[in-house]
Amino acid sequence: MNLFHLQAPFQATGDQPQAIAQLVNSIEKGNRFQTLLGATGTGKTFTIAATIEKIGKPTLVLAHNKTLAAQLCNELRQFFPENAVEYFISYYDYYQPEAYIPVSDTYIEKSASINDEIDMLRHSATRSLFERRDVVVVASISCIYGLGMPSEYLKASIGLEVGKEINQRQLLRDLVSVQYSRNDLDLQRGRFRLRGDVLELVPAYEDRVIRVEFFGDEIDAIRYLDPVTGNSLQSLERVNIYPARHFVTPDDQLEAACQGIELELEDRLEELEKQGKLLEAQRLGQRTRYDLELLREVGYCNGVENYSRYLAGREPGQPPECLIDYFPKDWLLVIDESHVTIPQLRGMYNGDQARKKVLIEHGFRLPSAADNRPLKAEEFWEKVNQCVFVSATPGNWEIEQSQGQVIEQIIRPTGVLDPEIFVRPTEGQVDDLLGEIKQRIKRKERVLITTLTKRMAEDLTEYFQERGVKVQYLHSEISSIERIEILQNLREGEFDVLIGVNLLREGLDLPEVSLVAILDADKEGFLRAERSLIQTIGRAARHIQGQAILYADNLTDSMIKAMEETERRRNIQMAHNKRHGITPQPIVTRSSNAILSFLDISRRLNAQQLEKVYDQADELPLEKVPELIGQLEEQMKEAAKKLEFEEAAKYRDRIQHLRDKLLGH
């Protein structure tokens, strides 16, 4: 019996059936790695969903950012409405890591804002992995960070069953020990209340209320309640209450951890004093002893993750346990856009260690803090059972690992061909391009233009605007929310031409684009490498009349390879259409409104305007202060994202000042 039940309004077509059969065959043979080389718009997600259904293994789908993970999760939930499709990304709305800048002697404390809903989804993912096998978890790369110990997390869960006798007081103590808090007035996720013989709690992994009714010390009934109406939704025979936090440390292990921290502290202080670093020694001793006192008293301290090696009982250098360790041994990994995700996977460890090294050297953290880290690439691959790489342009490493198991998916279900490619000289390229743009505007089609430099993109935008073309420029400083809005405006025809330096990022699903123009196509480098050219040309692959113009005076190896690969795909597609009598049909895709509906997009003041408003904050009406705080928080998050810690700290202090102003009134 199949664990997964795929539901789709269409059947596999084109070369999807062949790709599905080959993937399933390769995985069932026990091959560790295989690659799905799928052209843009060929329905790779459907192919993966069909493969998951036939293989029937718990699956982790890895994406390289939150937005792409959300899109994949939504698609897979539509394909598997009866199964557990979970979403696991970093739960921080805003995260500024602890940092020290030696040049200015500036220490910045860790500051973070946790998204409660995402935290609930993370708990829901681990709960599903414990309770069922028909699970697909769509995760960002943050899943390689430590997540407590699955064995301790499961051991700490509280099992309740109708008819079971249990001491109510002991049950309350058990709930507190797994990080639930009592609140008889405001029942929220991670809280419980007791009224007479009725216990109500909201578990960490969902927003429904669990009601446990007692008759003496015997459990009489267990029900799910609607959190708003209080109506009974479902009666249960038994239920497991999992801890409110993933990091669970038993009392005996906590004391052993504290003793280990003390021993390391003594050794490190001696080492620093021998080096003449008296300030660093004093700083480290004071901070660590304060943390130890908190750990012993309340079992928690700010920055507790820096002691995770001791709390989890790991040896020095031993990899942390993460989401992957919650999967059973026979799990399946799918890496989407593998040509981007795998390099990101390799870089996570090095970036984390560089920041920690500075903190350790200057006495802010013990050397063991370096073990609070993401997995190294080699540690990650040691945990992988079987893997499918998915990309239109897989990297050499993926191809090598697949050892011949590279499955192509070239045919689009709609019959649309890869774009025609034209090479034109750079002399007079701008005026030539202007003529092409005007033709597309007449047909109500859209144009993408990619340049090599920001300056050229700006100049080109200005040039076209002066000639009456509705054009916008997409640059790296635009936030992801604004970016989605700009792309939506392009699709809806508010402007006709989009210019940018790197238009390879995910989310450029634009069926209205019929022309992609690549300027300076013969300048070798990352943005004009073979894979980058294929990806960029593919932006026009969703339009029946898709074309790509490469402006160049020479033919580089990358250009030749990209054109040969595109022509090879076109020939396969044309032969398939001719053989089956298929007439290409326009690709219809979901508008970005589905994403925008989840985002509160409002016009934001720029940094300079915010400075002026903040300077006059004392004269600002009280009802306007929360709005200013919200906009300052946006700037703080952007600064932290760019690793501008001092700037982010400045915004944090201003936000606190404004909150104090509100409280003072």
Curated annotation (Swiss-Prot):
Keyword DNA damage: yes
Residues at which ATP binds: G38, A39, T40, G41, T42, G43, K44, T45
Listed GO CC annotations: cytoplasm; excinuclease repair complex
Single GO term (MF): ATP hydrolysis activity
Main subcellular location: cytoplasm
Motif Beta-hairpin mapped to chain: 91-114
Record has Cytoplasm as a keyword: yes
Domain Helicase ATP-binding: 25-176
GO biological process: nucleotide-excision repair; SOS response
Residue span, Helicase C-terminal domain: 429-595
Keywords of this entry: ATP-binding, Cytoplasm, DNA damage, DNA excision, DNA repair, Excision nuclease, Helicase, Hydrolase, Nucleotide-binding, SOS response
Subcellular compartments: Cytoplasm
Signal peptide: none
Annotated CDD domains: DEXHc_UvrB, SF2_C_UvrB
Subunit structure: Forms a heterotetramer with UvrA during the search for lesions. Interacts with UvrC in an incision complex.
Swiss-Prot/TrEMBL domain comment: The beta-hairpin motif is involved in DNA binding.
Role description: The UvrABC repair system catalyzes the recognition and processing of DNA lesions. A damage recognition complex composed of 2 UvrA and 2 UvrB subunits scans DNA for abnormalities. Upon binding of the UvrA(2)B(2) complex to a putative damaged site, the DNA wraps around one UvrB monomer. DNA wrap is dependent on ATP binding by UvrB and probably causes local melting of the DNA helix, facilitating insertion of UvrB beta-hairpin between the DNA strands. Then UvrB probes one DNA strand for the presence of a lesion.
PANTHER family listed in its UniProt record: UVRABC SYSTEM PROTEIN B
Sequence similarity: Belongs to the UvrB family.
Entry protein name: UvrABC system protein B
Natural source organism: Gloeothece citriformis (strain PCC 7424) (Cyanothece sp. (strain PCC 7424))
